[in-house]
Amino acid sequence: METTIGIALTSFLVGLSGAMMPGPVLTITIGETAARLRPVGSIRHGGNPGDPSPGPPGGAQLLRGALAGPLIVLGHGILEVCLVVAVVLGLGQLLLRDSVVGWIGVVGGAVLVWMAWGMFRSLRGLSLGAAAGRGERRRHPVLAGILTSLANPYWAVWWATIGLGYIALSLKLGTAGLVAFYCGHILSDLAWYGAISLSLVLGHRLLTDRAYRGLVAACAVFLFGFGLYFGYAGVRALVA
């Protein structure tokens, strides 16, 4: 911890332990990766737009799927850069107030429930062979990374406690220490969520229409559960 390499390494390990725990960002990463494995247009595979089995994902779809995790981490990381700066400027104590944690939980929980509801509504029409001509619009992974991070009150609390402590230690080495801390932390997210997307891409041949809908449904259930839990925790913090 007395060198920039030590700070980066320990920051990576602590960040990885947190990233590996189930949460909204993991759920969105799985859902977005699966969605991006769908062929952009079934006509490219020689079938009609409504053909339920136009063929396996092509190289472009595999690449899009593999990039889902890194793009979500990009959105997550952009938000964390802003938060690191804010914490350094004194926002840490504000984030520990019950009223702030409470409102983050209530609003964040509502956002997660809304995202889950949208996933539930889309289940009936989901298909790996869906054509781009249907005009389906999806949330960009970078935006999804930002929204899911903002919706999690425990993310803000982590930065106001563990993150604040790490920042204080890092600043003993000046700007270099702070940069080392952030790089180690964000690389842990990139390593884990990138690995999740890559594993889904490598196993894409097992992703049938039925399995895809089941995966999206499971993600929606988890998001809905997280939303209710965050909302409940937020209300408890507000009435405490």
Regions found by a protein language model. Name each.
Residues 2-102, 162-180:
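Juxtamembrane transmembrane-helix termini in multi-pass membrane transport proteins
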Residues 11, 15, 19, 141, ...:
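Helical-face signature of the major facilitator-like transporter fold
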Residues 12, 16, 20, 117, ...:
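Hydrophobic/aromatic residues within the transmembrane alpha-helices of Major Facilitator Superfamily
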Residues 20, 139-161:
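Selected transmembrane alpha-helices and immediately adjacent juxtamembrane segments
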Residues 25-26, 79-90, 112-116, 155-156, ...:
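Alpha-helical transmembrane segments and their lipid-water interface positions
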Residues 97-127, 185-196, 207-240:
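Selective transmembrane alpha-helices of multi-pass membrane proteins
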Residues 125-144, 205:
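Flexible interhelical linker loops that connect adjacent transmembrane helices
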Residues 158-170, 230-238:
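Alpha-helical transmembrane segments and their membrane-interface junctions
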